[in-house]
């Protein structure tokens, strides 16, 4: 039995016409799923009983099982812990802004990258998510909260570009006007930097936003924070980003988690400005989340100094406003606690 959420629009049409249904039935089915959040064929009342029975024989529409939910009393940020059909767990987050709702979604169960400041990597890597499991996070959150998501960031558990095919296919699904209907410029892929995949992304014809999790201005420091840097150097990654920018013309967000005593020195800020010189970038400065006890946030004064040095060097930068601090909204924390409690 096929997961219908794994299928592209064109694949769904092919599948149902092969079963003898008319093409337009695909639009009816997708309207039930994406607009009405119905994942039971029996409830699709504009389909005949015969068609419903036939579809049930061949397809499933698995939304995700909610295991836990935390809501921030500060800003309403909502964090979800989901169970997949095989019993694995993943996290998603809904972030509320005055003019939009953003979803932060996962692409892997666990993560192989193991950045030292991220809770997800602490539990190891299990597997890639399917296209359907990525898409189901959006549908399940919308169904649970009865709200429409307008922006999507692939910044949850896992490295999206190490699950490239399913990530790209899920973006096409979420963007398709008959499916997720989310504007392509409202979708962001966040990556630690897989050079060949960044270049491949530039050729996809998808005008998504790209965010690079850099976190250090030198290979020596980045090797300590992001172990994958030993495979892909900063120079290789930034060269790939330059190729991406030449092809797309898009500005790239540089994510930089600031950790006291590790990457927050004045020399780090100056070096960061140097390596980003003449690039079309915006730097998002992120005070570290306390996922690991010995990692501390820099002082407010140091954050402002770091930002000022970048601005004076002609690099756009901002300190990201923390959301969901009271519910540990950083990805991986809720799942890690559950794993520890059940082991």
Curated annotation (Swiss-Prot):
It catalyses: adenosine(2503) in 23S rRNA + 2 reduced [2Fe-2S]-[ferredoxin] + 2 S-adenosyl-L-methionine = 2-methyladenosine(2503) in 23S rRNA + 5'-deoxyadenosine + L-methionine + 2 oxidized [2Fe-2S]-[ferredoxin] + S-adenosyl-L-homocysteine; adenosine(37) in tRNA + 2 reduced [2Fe-2S]-[ferredoxin] + 2 S-adenosyl-L-methionine = 2-methyladenosine(37) in tRNA + 5'-deoxyadenosine + L-methionine + 2 oxidized [2Fe-2S]-[ferredoxin] + S-adenosyl-L-homocysteine. [4Fe-4S] cluster binds at residues 111, 115, 118. This is Probable dual-specificity RNA methyltransferase RlmN. Residues 97-326 form the Radical SAM core domain. S-adenosyl-L-methionine binds at residues 158-159, 190, 213-215, 289. Its cofactor is [4Fe-4S] cluster. It is found in: Cytoplasm. PROSITE patterns: RADICAL_SAM. One of its GO terms (molecular function) is 4 iron, 4 sulfur cluster binding.
